[in-house]
Amino acid sequence: MSDIQNSLREQAREVLLCCHAEKKAQYALDVFTAHQKGELRTSLLENKGWPERPGRPETPELLSPKDMPKRRSGGPAGRIGLLHALAHIELNAIDLAFDLLGRFENTPMPEEFYTDWLRVGAEEAKHFMLLQGRLKSLGRHEGPLP
């Protein structure tokens, strides 16, 4: 593994930039596992800059809550809408956790900072995958709702 590949910051950057929701979640879990095994350094030899925004799938289009269509909360469609919203929240939580791992490159942080945020990111990834699995069992996925 090269110095860049085994850099926690670089791996966090790659999670953040990933545009495919399921791959992002799996990659977050893989980075957590690699860190647990001691395979990642918490410093970076090369600064590629930090993304302003996380990678996102082309769909669904991100809208302000005020621009979202009103959905009924009851019935199967309402439950699917709720699961979909929760999956989207978990995807954003993955990005928030992994953004924190690299954004403060010039501020020395204790190892526990990285360990804790990696754990948070991995937990959010697990939550996303559980919700995604449930949505798939209902014939849907995290993405645009009809």
Give the location of each predicted region.
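Non-heme di-metal
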Residues: 1-146
